[in-house]
Curated annotation (Swiss-Prot):
Species annotation: Arabidopsis thaliana (Mouse-ear cress)
Listed Polar residues bias regions: 312-335
Descriptive protein name: Uncharacterized protein At2g02148
Cystine pairings recorded for this chain: none
Biased composition (Low complexity): 341-366
Stretches the record annotates as Disordered: 37-61, 127-151, 298-378
Amino acid sequence: MGARVQVQHYNLGSSDSYIATSLHDLNSVDGPPRDIDGIGGAVGRDGDSLDNDGDSSSADCMHESYRNSMQIGVEEGGSNMENKGSAYIMLNIEDVSPIEAARGRFLQIILDYFISQHVIEVCESKRDHDVDSGGRDSNSKVKRKSDDTRYEGDPSFALPLMYIANLYETLVGEANVRLASLNGIRDKTIGVALEAAGGLYRKLTKKFPKKGTCMYRRRELATSVETRTRFPELVIHEEKRVRFVVVNGLDIVEKPSDLPIEEAEWFKRLTGRNEVAISARDYKFYCPRRKHRRLQNSVSSINGLPTFPGIDSSTLANTQGFREDQSQQQHTPSPSKHHMSSLSHQFHQSIHQSHQHHQSIYQSQHAATHYPSQNHQCDPELSHTQMACLQPLTGGHVMPNSPAKFCDQCGAQYLRETSKFCSECGSKRLGI
């Protein structure tokens, strides 16, 4: 019996600190220490079970109903979590095959269910006023019919194009992370360029046109009191003046309810989200998108004349009609090549520093006295190399004098010759 005195150290009342409201029948065990001693004596009298189960843990001393309730609770909780996540967590290759169709389907879901439209009927007085103020004279060739526009976007709802682009790129980024785990797909992206033919901007203009029986006006807003109040996320203190385009009558739906079940399950599998819903942090932020023309800078080409980065000298020489004699190259000794490279390096330095002109002439004459047989090889190569280097400077690698007529980002035509920003996407115009 002396070995069983340690049973008193098992404080059965301590289970309340872990699970306070699991089972109320265990509260009857909690009592004065003398009751616990009585329980210890009872356990001592029935010590055969403890002797047989010497390796059991302290949890075996708990009541049987308490152990059963714990197991049932864990099993129910685990089954709920498994049923909740297994329905859409797996993404198969069949979901995104072919990838072109998946891209169009993904973009169409965003346009159809995450963007809502609010239109109002155009009154006759406003329509006639627009017709009178549209043309300068009555004989103008371009006239707007009085019964052409019947509905227009509600001006009280204005949605920046930047918000739509931010939402699309956020969801595309989440889908691309899921696509990276799939094998057998070459293009691991579900997104399309915003300014492409089948991109977001063209699809948006096609569904919500600027002209027609139902029109959605575009407005260009700048930093003002209105923009600070309605769109505080687009007003950045680092930017002196922010310009962006809003579309009247459009609004973003954060939790669409009319999405079909099949499309909703595909969207959740593709993005990895628990539900078909978005939040304000997915699109309400400032993200400038500026696309510049890819032009070679003439200044960088001048600085890179001695090294010719990225250009094969043999190809450059062959384009100018100069072909080196293979037999002469084989019999050319190595000291002459080293001396030719030093001469070409000094020659290109004379372009930037005119005071080294006489020094290069003296070195060329000195080379002619020591290597008379190789003098006729150095001069043609230097002359043709000089022509090949200076010819791109006189070509078309110069910035255009006139400004661009079309926007590089969305492809829309500028309304005026003095426009500094695009009226569609708000990007800055090049050449001004």
